Regions:
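Active-site-proximal catalytic alpha-helix in oxidoreductases
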Residues: 1-41
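NAD(P)-dependent Rossmann-like dehydrogenase/reductase catalytic/cofactor-binding core
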Residues: 34-109
């Protein structure tokens, strides 16, 4: 379930900025996608009270990308998922600068 959340929240939130497919996300916006995935993993760790191997989860996310490379990053639930991730991070006292940057960019457009 954690891997599924990493995939969905990362692709939806980064997709708010980049649009496109998951294969384009990784090929054109890897640094942002990796940073956001790591923030999402920290949120998942706080929610579950467990620690996770971020590199292994990101590898799992990439395997999912390979399974459906043309899958679109952003659906209509993306803004709500971003808001929920920020709320969860706030409740856990986590530093999530990339997710906050995406939210700030959404407010100015």
């Amino acid at each position: 379930l954690v891997l599924k959340n990493v995939y969905i929240v990362t692709t939806n939130c980064v997709g708010l900025v980049t649009g496109g497919s998951v294969s384009e996300l990784w090929s054109r916006h890897r640094e942002l996608a990796d940073a956001v995935a790591r923030e999402v993993i920290s949120i998942q760790a706080a929610l579950t009270g467990r620690t996770f191997d971020a590199d292994a989860l990101i590898e799992g996310m990439l395997k999912a990308f390979d399974g459906d490379p043309d899958h679109k990053c952003m659906g209509r639930s993306a803004p709500a998922r971003l808001a929920r991730a920020i709320q969860q991070a706030d409740e856990a006292g986590l530093d999530i600068p990339r997710l906050r940057g995406i939210a700030a960019a959404q407010q100015t457009t």
